[in-house]
């Protein structure tokens, strides 16, 4: 099984998250993309605005009825800070090929993550390129970053359009998805101002936010 792993705070989940997941699933022929809300984000000083329970509920609502997308509570049920290395380790299985999905900005800080060297032996990476730049431009940017911060972990394969990790034959791919200028921060501010978030988040999520009084 080709399994996409998409972690995040999802505070709240929105149409941008979902559209990206669908496009990555199709582009890389993934059997499934699992969206995993973190319990406590280790790289965010103020934590999440909504509780883990609420964020998980919203992710479950957002993917309900959508073939190929699934919500998981594995990081929330584990408790404590959510570390990607532990998540990918727990998902290892002979019948699974893991693809870890993350944005370029997150990738360019990966040398600050816990046991970051091990990540490249646990899963392929799918790095989401910025919408205003092409894959080739991003590859050049990432090549510089790897050379300076991750020496010995990956080498470029420019003719193939990816980097090859030097452990377990994993690869670092690049993908561009439809540019949707939507952010969870903007949604929280919009809710706080008493304005509508219709068509920014799934209707079920919008109703849940109102019902629970989130982000006020």
From Swiss-Prot:
Signal peptide: none annotated. GO terms for biological process: NAD biosynthetic process. Keywords: ATP-binding, NAD, Nucleotide-binding, Nucleotidyltransferase, Pyridine nucleotide biosynthesis, Transferase. SUPFAM superfamilies: Nucleotidylyl transferase. It catalyses: nicotinate beta-D-ribonucleotide + ATP + H(+) = deamido-NAD(+) + diphosphate. It comes from the Bacteria. GO terms for molecular function: ATP binding; nicotinate-nucleotide adenylyltransferase activity. Pathway: Cofactor biosynthesis; NAD(+) biosynthesis; deamido-NAD(+) from nicotinate D-ribonucleotide: step 1/1. Its EC number is 2.7.7.18. It holds the Pfam family CTP_transf_like. NCBIfam families: cyt_tran_rel, nicotinate (nicotinamide) nucleotide adenylyltransferase, PRK00071.1-1, PRK00071.1-3. Belongs to the NadD family. Catalyzes the reversible adenylation of nicotinate mononucleotide (NaMN) to nicotinic acid adenine dinucleotide (NaAD). This is Probable nicotinate-nucleotide adenylyltransferase. The gene is nadD.
